[in-house]
Amino acid sequence: MGTSIIIPWLKENYGCEVIAVVADVGQDEEVHKLEAKALRSGASKVFIDDLRREFVTGSLWPLLKSGAVYEGAYLLGSSIARPLIAKRQIEIAIQEGADAVAHGCPAIGNDQVRFERAYTAFAPQLKVIAPWREWSIRSRYEALSYARDHRIQVTAADESTYSHDSNLWHMSYEGGTLDDLTAAPPKDFFERTMNPSASPDGESEITIDFESGVPVGLNGTAIPPVQIIEDLNEIGGTNGIGRVDLVEDCNEHVKSRGIYETPGGTLITTAHRELESLVLDRQTRHQKEILAMNYAQLVYDGYWFSPLREALDAFFAKTNEKIKGSITLSLYKGNIVVKSRKSPNSLYRADVSSLAAQAHL
């Protein structure tokens, strides 16, 4: 909601020209319609950039190679998108000669930290304006009132009592009735995944093919990076895969409840982990698990543009060099069962591992 009212507020309170930036990272909305909305709200110019492929290859695939999962459940869908968005915002700010950048992140939350650490990494000289830390608006209801007073078009998502975020990798929901830890999400709450009880009664099988640690095809057919996530989102969502209801530790030393849908990401992460179990030796695999926790914390905290992340990426790139092969998964009502594991680089040897062989050692 905050991003919908920032433009008129900035013009009123700073008397400045406002240039809007829309980063398409696969969010579930018609991005092209945002240009007209921003111009009606008072923006002098609107940049709409399709960053989906860069998001996948430059952000999601390094994340996948790391094996990072925050607090055992969160696949970092929101966290991983923020650095790329902020980087593009800074590039446009410099290109257009801006002297400040602004974001619509709440004053209590992780995203403000992620954006601002990225801003600092690329343009520490630019002033950062965070309206939620300045204005008198203190709730979504008050933000909606401001929007109506200024004749700003609001969407169904704006009017929702929940805060939500989406991109190719996931959807997230916070706030509203979810703040009550005894309350279950409404039945019609989820957008990308079917309720497992209502999903197909028969099993679905999918084979994910990998090269150098990243998925390159399904069932033996090569598929481009963006499409492979879209296809797996559809397959996983239809089978009720990828829901997480998590109470997580935030940057501000508070706990927050988040509900996430990551159908395609869950399938890809599961398959990648299975391939690693075949290919990596024990010492490397165990060390990687430790570093994956560090990587998850780094991404969550907004340190994407840091020497540490670059160093860790070099390690994970090395460990993924031989992650090649195919994993077949069976999907049934929210469950994933591994049906087949194949890799030309597998360290598994049935002749050594079988009980019969061990009896002769």
Q: What is each of the regions a protein language model found here?
A:
Residues 2-361:
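Nucleotide-activated chemistry modules centered on ATP-dependent adenylation/adenylyltransferase
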